[in-house]
């Protein structure tokens, strides 16, 4: 199974994506571990959270987790998020 299929399989299995928004970077690792302990394996880190790219990198250190970037507003943000390890991208509607 390829990366895309793995990501989709985990999302389908868990049926829950936890959104991490506005969490201080210093608390991110503990929050991620607590979510994993509670069975949450799919996370979206919003890019309007200070240190979001570092939080994505931190989350990706764990096994069996899917990590995405949310509130992505530009191609540049998309590239940075993917470089940080995001496995999916979410963007709000924009006119």
Which residue stretches match the model-derived regions?
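Glycine-rich phosphate-binding active-site loops on the catalytic face of alpha/beta enzymes
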Residues: 85-95
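Conserved N-terminal beta1-alpha1 strand-loop-helix module at the mouth
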Residues: 1-84
